[in-house]
Curated annotation (Swiss-Prot):
One of its GO terms (cellular component) is extracellular region. Keywords: Detoxification, Secreted, Signal. InterPro entries: SMR-like. Transmembrane segments: none annotated. It comes from the Eukaryota. It holds the Pfam family PROL5-SMR. It is found in: Secreted. This is Submaxillary gland androgen-regulated protein 2, isoform beta. It comes from Mus musculus (Mouse). One of its GO terms (biological process) is response to toxic substance.
Length: 41
């Protein structure tokens, strides 16, 4: 269970990092992953 949580955290961090690189993030379509509305906290 802890492994799944770590994978989720890493996925969100990667999404946030790609959101900074708007051009590349738009190509991969991962930037919405870092939307504050999608985060539970």
């Amino acid at each position: 269970m802890k492994a799944l949580y770590m994978v989720f955290v890493l996925w969100v961090l990667i999404g946030c990092f790609l959101r900074l690189l708007k051009d590349e993030a738009t190509v991969f379509g991962l930037w919405p992953l870092c939307s504050y509305r999608m985060l539970p906290f």
